[in-house]
Regions:
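Short, low-complexity disordered leader/linker segments with a strong preference
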Residues: 1-34, 329-333
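Short, glycine-/small- and polar/acidic-enriched structural segments
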Residues: 26-161, 165-168, 184-190, 201-206, ...
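Solvent-exposed, polar/charged alpha-helical surfaces in well-ordered, non-transmembrane soluble domains
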Residues: 53, 76, 80, 94, ...
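Short polybasic/polar patches that bind polyanions
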Residues: 56, 154, 197, 262, ...
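Short, solvent-exposed loop/beta-turn-alpha elements that line the ligand-binding surface or hinge
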Residues: 57, 209-214, 280-289
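Pocket-lining segment of extracytoplasmic ligand-binding domains
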Residues: 91, 166, 172-262
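Secondary-structure end/capping motifs
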Residues: 229-307
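Conserved C-terminal helix/tail region of periplasmic/extracytoplasmic solute-binding proteins
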Residues: 298-333
Length: 333
């Protein structure tokens, strides 16, 4: 059974379980509408949206579906019609969804940055130009953290391919590899990169924002085009919930950090450190950063991240949907 097949079976099983256990929705504008939302155990507003019932209180029935195969798995489930919404990184999403170009659109961002390059505390690496012939652990060869790492090297005049890459697949896996000495460099993401500094096994070399010289586009929601077409008001309510939950992170950091840490199954200190040291931050605007995304994926194209016969900058302009976020923000009190 291949990866896509395993992912779809897992999503179907999760939906079956949730359809049995989902509580009845309240009366409201969303009554009779079910939203299947895929999520990952990462730093996000999802746990706040869930605990505060921001969608359910409007009448929606929400199936919160855990995704274990990363954004590629979520993309497969969205394309197959098993998920309506998925949380993910805006840059990775362009690369991955370009293989199913009409399946979905990125509709609203919460964060910037989040992708960070760390080196071992035992390493003599001082800057990106020193990363040549090194062992580098990544979560995947086509992920956003790997892309921002390679952009940083390219900017420093270094050939990113002049290193040996190891794929860990998970954040905790990267922590373990660095701790064991299996790699000298980590192209990682929060909160696990923060954990490396707190454990004094690694130090931050540069962030995604450092790599591109501006706020690095981060994470947000991706919606299937079918769901957008059939339930545009539900899309707006989803964004209202996302933006309210993200506002909560800014206004109630102590409670939010605890909630996000429990959700991601990490220490609260790592989440707090990630925000306080600007390894991740709340975006200045929740509207997708089209210019930043297009500029970043243009470099991704040069670095070989694009699937065959795909022009990532052209696709990104189609994939980023700013209209819903702009409308929701314009009508906020």
């Amino acid at each position: 059974m291949n990866l896509v097949r395993r992912t779809l079976v897992a999503v179907a099983a999760s939906l079956a379980l949730f359809s049995i256990g989902t509580a009845g929705a309240a009366d409201g504008p969303g009554k009779g509408i079910t939203i299947n939302i895929g999520y990952f155990p990462v730093v996000s507003p999802v746990p706040i949206m869930r605990t505060q019932h921001l969608l359910e209180d409007k009448g929606y029935t929400v199936n919160w579906v855990p995704i274990t195969q990363g954004l590629p798995g979520a993309a497969s489930a969205v394309a197959a019609g098993q998920l309506d919404i998925a949380w993910g990184n805006s840059i990775s999403a362009v690369v991955i969804f370009s293989q199913s170009p009409d399946a979905a659109q990125f509709i609203g961002q919460s964060f910037i940055n989040a992708n960070v390059t760390v080196v071992s505390t035992k390493s003599d690496i001082k800057s990106a130009k020193d990363i040549v012939g090194k062992k580098v652990v990544v979560s995947g060869m086509k992920t956003a953290s790997t892309l921002f790492f390679q952009i940083g090297l390219k900017k420093a005049g270094v050939d990113p391919t002049a290193n040996e890459y190891f794929v860990s697949g998970t954040g905790p896996g990267m922590v373990g590899v660095l701790d064991s000495g299996g790699a000298e460099v980590v192209a990682g993401y929060v909160p696990y990169v923060a954990d490396m500094e707190l454990k004094k096994i690694g130090r931050v070399l540069f962030t995604g924002s450092d790599a591109i010289g501006r706020a690095a586009p981060g994470d947000g929601f991706i919606a299937s085009t079918k769901f957008i077409r059939e339930h545009p008001e539900a899309v707006k309510d989803l964004l209202r919930a996302q933006f309210a939950a993200t506002d909560y992170i800014k206004s109630n950091p102590n409670e939010a950090y605890k909630s996000m840490a429990e959700f991601a199954k990490v220490d609260e200190a790592a989440v707090r450190y990630s925000f306080e040291k600007n390894l991740i931050g709340v975006a200045s605007s929740y509207v997708p950063d089209v210019d930043g995304i297009v500029a970043t994926v243009a470099v991704a194209q040069e670095l070989g991240f694009a699937p065959k016969d795909v022009d990532l900058p052209t696709y990104a302009k189609k994939f980023e949907n700013t209209s819903f976020a702009r409308e929701v923000l314009a009508k906020r009190p």
